[in-house]
Amino acid sequence: MPRDRIVAESGMILRTEKSVLFVIPWGNHWIVGTTDTDWNLDLAHPAATKADIDYILEHVNTVLATPLKHDDIEGVYAGLRPLLAGESEETSKLSREHAVARVAPGLVAIAGGKYTTYRVMAADAVRR
């Protein structure tokens, strides 16, 4: 989202009925998100759906003086989380913890985790 579309000096954190949305300043833009949507299509090409974008706009617009529109969006990106298997079918209910295993002599594998804890994950992998 272009920086001039949101009048603010700092980022925001918004709580929704399903998640938390972030509005983060980044250079000349704002990064607005995130969603946690099941993805059952091509795993090599995840994409933000119209429903994801509508959800974000609907919720962020509740706190903005000037609502954002689809035409304001300059780019979107999506990714998949490497979640560990668990008890639930819903990804939003699965643990964000990571696991480290020595697969073979000299080979360590790591699964799960979050981008925000990559340093802890790396340290755990090195200690193996």
Predicted segments — roles?
Residues M1-R128:
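C-terminal catalytic lobe of FAD-dependent flavoproteins
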